[in-house]
């Protein structure tokens, strides 16, 4: 019944172990205030639940256009970035043409490419998690139809060199995934709205609205018109559109303040983790850290026993014994620091 292609696929897995402190999914640890949730109840009262949502997300596009400083016609609203990735792979080039992907990176690029049967052209990363120029050149020589660049890269946390992204743009359609833009400030949006050969993806998930599943694909107006032909009708729910629009319109300053707190915690947490024996902490431009330890399975399980959930990413290429840790609230980060110190004492006595 299923195709050979589907039989070979591996499902994307997330960490679901229940823990008191969740530092595994790169979420904003701050929930909406109760007063804001009460305001959203009023928003819900105005929703006609018997009607389909606006297929063009008109009002939300207008709100996002102000946030991203582009025109509404430069935006397609998606049900999370994953939907945008699928449309891009379907719409750019032919299905038998390859996808350029740095490795390791966000796994969904590979998952969706494999689901569609598209060849994958890997670009190895060096010890600083920058693209290896030799393997990059080899990948480009295979003439991929599209490239996906997570910038900052998930799970390594670093920004890629501008010169490498510029080289990729010269050879193929380039998608810059800026899911973590708010934590670094580096963007290619101004290029994307002028260049028909590139696009930018954004999401509301990492800034505190993960439950709404709202993403945005940004490009030239002509590009958005064409790629929108692939979009499923009513792809973003009425409730997600209405709530995202209300929160961004009325409470974006609160979200920006939370981001500032997380960036401050990023500096503090980096110093604290670096002082713990047996842990190598990599620099990060995102809301998470990548650490290297001697035994990731042991550390990961030990943290779970202490009620702290992190992400063991040892299954990714070249990341054996690496763990990704989301930046939490101060008290959560303190609990993490203390737990790792206790584990380190047990291991290195």
UniProtKB/Swiss-Prot annotation:
Q: Which Gene3D superfamilies does the record associate with it?
A: Aspartate Aminotransferase, domain 1 (3.90.1150.10), Type I PLP-dependent aspartate aminotransferase-like (Major domain) (3.40.640.10)
Enzyme Commission number(s) from the entry: 2.6.1.9
Keyword rRNA processing in the entry? The reply is no
Q: Which cofactors, if any, are listed as required?
A: pyridoxal 5'-phosphate
Keywords, A to Z?
Amino-acid biosynthesis, Aminotransferase, Histidine biosynthesis, Pyridoxal phosphate, Transferase
Q: Which reaction does it catalyse?
A: L-histidinol phosphate + 2-oxoglutarate = 3-(imidazol-4-yl)-2-oxopropyl phosphate + L-glutamate
**Signal peptide span:** none
Pfam families recorded:
Aminotran_1_2
Pathway entry: Amino-acid biosynthesis; L-histidine biosynthesis; L-histidine from 5-phospho-alpha-D-ribose 1-diphosphate: step 7/9
List this protein's GO terms for biological process: L-histidine biosynthetic process
> Where is the PTM N6-(pyridoxal phosphate)lysine found along the chain?
206
| NCBIfam families cross-referenced by the UniProt entry | hisC
For this protein, the record's HAMAP family field holds: HisC_aminotrans_2
Protein family = Belongs to the class-II pyridoxal-phosphate-dependent aminotransferase family. Histidinol-phosphate aminotransferase subfamily.
Subunit-structure text: Homodimer.
Protein name per the record: Histidinol-phosphate aminotransferase
Q: Which species?
A: Hydrogenobaculum sp. (strain Y04AAS1)
Q: What does UniProt list as this organism's lineage?
A: Bacteria, Pseudomonadati, Aquificota, Aquificia, Aquificales
Which gene name does the record give?
Answer: hisC
């Amino acid at each position: 019944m299923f195709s050979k292609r589907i039989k070979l696929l591996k499902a994307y897995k997330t960490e679901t172990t229940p823990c008191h402190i969740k530092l595994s999914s790169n979420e904003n640890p701050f929930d909406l205030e109760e007063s804001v949730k009460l305001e959203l109840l009023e928003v819900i009262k105005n929703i006609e639940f018997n009607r389909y949502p606006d297929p063009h997300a008109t009002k939300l596009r207008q709100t996002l256009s102000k946030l991203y400083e582009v025109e509404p016609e430069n935006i397609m609203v998606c049900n999370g970035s994953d939907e945008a990735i699928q449309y891009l792979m379907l719409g750019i080039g032919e299905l038998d043409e390859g996808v350029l992907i740095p490795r390791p990176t966000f796994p969904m690029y590979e998952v969706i490419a494999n689901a569609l049967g598209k060849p994958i052209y890997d670009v190895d990363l060096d010890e600083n998690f920058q693209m290896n120029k030799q393997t990059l050149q080899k990948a480009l020589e295979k003439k991929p139809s599209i490239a996906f660049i997570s910038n900052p890269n998930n799970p390594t946390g670093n920004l890629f060199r501008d010169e490498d992204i510029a080289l990729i743009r010269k050879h193929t359609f380039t998608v810059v995934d800026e899911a973590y833009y708010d934590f670094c400030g580096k963007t290619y949006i101004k290029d994307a709205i002028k260049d028909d050969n590139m696009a930018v993806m954004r999401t509301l998930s990492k800034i505190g609205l993960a439950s709404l599943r709202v993403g945005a694909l940004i490009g030239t107006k002509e590009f958005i018109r064409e790629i929108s032909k692939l979009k499923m009708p009513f792809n973003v729910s009425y409730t997600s559109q209405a709530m995202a629009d209300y929160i961004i319109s009325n409470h974006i300053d609160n979200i920006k303040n939370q981001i500032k707190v997380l960036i401050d915690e990023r500096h503090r947490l980096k110093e604290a983790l670096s002082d713990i024996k047996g842990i190598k902490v990599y620099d990060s431009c995102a809301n998470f850290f990548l650490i290297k330890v001697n035994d990731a399975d042991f550390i990961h399980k030990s943290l779970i026993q202490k009620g702290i959930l992190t992400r063991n990413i040892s299954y990714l290429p070249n990341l054996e014994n690496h763990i990704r840790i989301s930046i939490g609230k101060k008290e959560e980060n303190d609990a993490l620091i203390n737990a790792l110190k206790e584990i380190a004492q047990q291991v290195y006595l």
